[in-house]
Amino acid sequence: MRTLWIMAVLLLGVEGSLIELGKMIFQETGKNPVKNYGLYGCNCGVGNRGKPVDATDRCCFVHKCCYKKVTGCDPKKDRYSYSWENKAIVCGEKNPPCLKQVCECDKAVAICLRENLGTYDKKHRVTVKFLCKAPESC
């Protein structure tokens, strides 16, 4: 558990409740979220949005678009509750509506990253963001 907390803290600059998002990505993919997704493509981790380089990067693009729809809380900082039940993410029912939305955005990106593990390409692990092409609209 301590390792997950350290990984989440290292995700500084990544949008979303860092601790929850990092844990979800690890639980769904088995991958270290900082090492594998912190600088991946044009949309994962820190940096601006750009045209996705592959399906993995598209997951992060959709995640950032999901956050743009959130109102009433700060998806970058505000924490929410969720549980891991039978290998599935369950957003807490006691979360206020805004944080429920943030949790669902984070859940969706974690599942998307798992579903697209086959498209993950180590050559995109560290992408120079200013070389990314203009992003599509959400």
From Swiss-Prot:
Disulfide bonds join C42-C132, C44-C60, C59-C112, C65-C138, C66-C105, C73-C98, C91-C103. GO terms for cellular component: extracellular region. Expressed by the venom gland. GO terms for biological process: arachidonate secretion; lipid catabolic process; phospholipid metabolic process. Residues 1-16 form the signal peptide. The record marks K129 as: Cationic membrane-docking site (MDoS). Keywords: Disulfide bond, Myotoxin, Secreted, Signal, Toxin. PROSITE patterns: PA2_ASP, PA2_HIS. SUPFAM superfamilies: Phospholipase A2, PLA2. It is found in: Secreted. InterPro entries: PLipase_A2 (IPR001211), PLipase_A2_Asp_AS (IPR033112), PLipase_A2_dom (IPR016090), PLipase_A2_dom_sf (IPR036444), PLipase_A2_His_AS (IPR033113). Pfam families: Phospholip_A2_1. Residues 122-133 are annotated as: Important for membrane-damaging activities in eukaryotes and bacteria. The record marks K122, R125 as: Important residue of the cationic membrane-docking site (MDoS). One of its GO terms (molecular function) is toxin activity. Snake venom phospholipase A2 (PLA2) that lacks enzymatic activity. Displays myotoxic activities. A model of myotoxic mechanism has been proposed: an apo Lys49-PLA2 is activated by the entrance of a hydrophobic molecule (e.g. fatty acid) at the hydrophobic channel of the protein leading to a reorientation of a monomer. PANTHER family: BASIC PHOSPHOLIPASE A2 PA-11-LIKE, PHOSPHOLIPASE A2 FAMILY MEMBER. Belongs to the phospholipase A2 family. Group II subfamily. K49 sub-subfamily. This is Basic phospholipase A2 homolog G6K49.
